[in-house]
Every structure is written in C-alpha cells, then in structure tokens.
Amino acid sequence: MNERTKMDFDYDLFVIGGGSGGVRAARVAASKSGARIGIAEESRYGGTCVIRGCVPKKLMVFASSYAPAMRQAVSYGWDVATGAFDWPAFQINLEKELDRLEAVYRKLLKNSGVETFDLRATVTGPHEVCLADGRKLTSKIILIATGGVPSIPLIEGAEHVITSNEIFHLKKLPKRILIVGGGYIACEFAGILNGFGVDTHLWYRGPKVLRGFDEEARDVITQGMKERGVTIITETETTKIDKIEGCFVVTDISGVEHTFDLVMYATGRRPNTQGLGLEEININLDGAGAVEVNNYSQTPIASVYAIGDVTDRVNLTPVAIREAMAFVETAFNGNPTPVDHSLIPSAVFTQPEYGMIGLSEDEAQKREPIEVYTTNFRPMNTAFIDEPNKVLMKLIVSQATRRVLGCHIVADGAAEMIQMAGIAVKMGATKEDFDKVCAVHPTMSEELVTMKSPIRKA
C-alpha cells in the first residue's frame, strides 16, 4: 500500500454492516500488510445470522424437539415424563450464547487490527461515510454489507405485530399465536412454537406454503406440520388487527374475526438499504431495494461494493461469506473473482426438516427430459412409535447426461445429509455414480444409493 493512498484516505476499506459477510471481508482485508480497515455496526456484531436468525433459531429448534423425543422415549422403555417448558430459563441460556458469539466476532476483528464503530453509518460520497455522531470518514473502498430486515405489509393494526426479530425476546410464550406467511421463516417458527406447546396457526395467502421449493417436498412438509399439530390455513389474508383487552382480534378476508394472544408476521425480508444514502451517489437499487452489483459485487461506482443479503442474490450466510472472500480477492489481491451462485445446498429447519440442492422437479422438467427417483417411508426410529414422521428421498436426473440435477431430502437430520450429498451433486455426479456407492445400513440416507428405477419421467 503506497504512501499516497494512506495519506489520501482515512481507511483502505470501510465496511458498513457487522454481519458474517462484512466481518469476514474486514478481517481478511486487514491481513493485507499496511491496510487500514474500519467497520460500523449499529446493532450487534454477528448480524442477522448470529444474533436474530440462523443461530438462535436453530437453538430454538433443538429446544422444541425435546418434548416429542421424551414422549417417544417411553415406547423404547424409558420411564420419563414431559414437564413444562421453561421459556425464561431457555432465554437466559440463549442470551449467554449470543453474547459469547458476539464477543468472538469482536475479538476476531480486534485481533485483525480492524477499527470498530458501534454506530450507524451512511454513504455520503464515493469515498466518504458519515457516522451517526456526525463524524465523516474517507475510504479508498466502501463495502455495503447491511443485510436484510423483515418486511411487514401495510395493513390496519400492523403496529401490533411482531417479526422474527422480536420472537427471541418475548417475556412469556403465548398460549395461541397466529403466524402470517408461508415462507421458510414462517414454517420454521410454526414448528418451533408448536413444539413448545403453543397453539399455533399459520395463515398464507397462496395455495400452498413454501413456494419456490420442490412440490413433492412441500406436500410432505405440510402434511408433517399438520400431523404435528400446526393449523395451516391457505388462501387467506389478514385485513385488520385490533388489540382488545390484551388479546389481538384478527379479521380475515371473509370478515371473520379470530382471537390470538400474539400475531407474528413472516411475510418476507427486504434489503436493508433505506436511509443509507446510496441513491444520492447514483447507486442503483432494484424494485425491492437491493443494491445492484456485477459478478464481482461491484456497483456502478467503482469504489463501492456490496455483498450479502443487501444484494438479494442468494440470501444465505455461507454465500455472504464466499462473496466476502471473492471481494477481497478482487479489490485487494488484484485477482478479479466472481462468485459461483450455482448448486448451493441449503436447508429449511421445519419439522420435518428439509435439505435440498439443485433444481426442483418442476424447474428441471422445464429445461430438459428428466427421470425422477423418489421414495417416501417411515424411518426405523419410529418402529415402536405411533407418531407422524415420514421421510422423503428424491433425486432428479437428466435423461441425456445422467447427471443428478437435484437432490431433495425431508427427514430428521436432512440438513446434515444434504451437505454430504451436495458434494457429489456439485462435482457433477451421475445417477450411476450414486449407484456405485455401497449403502450404509440401516440408515435413512441409504435410500439415496439404492433407488434403482425411476418413479416417473418428464
């Protein structure tokens, strides 16, 4: 880094947003000799994933799974009784863990030599940011990594609802909750709260929840949620929410009123770009408010980059981290590196759990002739148990190349399984490659290598 650069700017890189992507970019860039890095975060370091998303949600999934596990243990000979769930005790442990993780993020930044600012920052020029306390700082490169925020429709009484941000901080669990939305966040929290013993209702305006995912997987998950006790009502909407005597009266599109102790909206997320000042320096935002970038995460303003959910490309934490690494290669190492957004494995922590990589059956058949290998069965651990727990294993195969175009798993531990299956799919494995692998018996996942004949062709 030459002396002129050091003199011209306060920083070589200034990052706005202390989530997984922003922190990774700051840390790795700071490892460059002489590079001065600053980062601003208005909330808590760790961002959505660590503080109010993936991590606390997964811990809630664990917590909610113990009640059915204890019920099932009786069938296996254990003399156990399911007691009441202690929400305050769980919250104390949860907050301790989140504090620990945030401290790790802060320590990593400090040890890397990154200067941190616990303040909101906005962009006021191609090389300038303004902190909430009025200080203006200059930087050779600015990286926007502000993530996304919950989006709530404008309806009468919207001020009464909570979102996934607030669900972790409830003083007590409601007896009866309405969750509005049909995406993965809505379905995940429906399963969690139902597992805690909350009378859980999910309303969705579309015909079927989990739009955009594989149809067969959606059906298995929906059936599993209902059998576990979640009330799912589709093709309905809320028109008004009134707070009456400590409860919430929700009016649906038919004019019928329903009473709940709490209403949670999980109707999607939007890029966190409001008030950042990007429009003032001619950085393009799309219709959803996402920062428009090229394959190298660069905006039309050469000195400004953006990564993660704020770009609304693939909104997953591991993707934001990969985008951060590619950004450093591009901006600091002189090695322009695009991010590969194809064939990314992902999971939905519904109950039952869903893991997938590649194309859905509908997507694949629109592209080329395919074969579909699928099996739906009760797993071995339910041999003594009269409870709903169906497993789906599904491979979508190209008729022409024999490559596995998509893999879908609905089962306990599906997320763990899809990580391994994803390696094969990413490498371009064919159905015959899967067939060559000896099964591990007895397991659920052995079905991935023992399905010999296609169920259907399309």
Across the structure, where does each feature detected by a protein language model lie?
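Catalytic nucleophile loop
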Residues: G22, G183-A186, A320
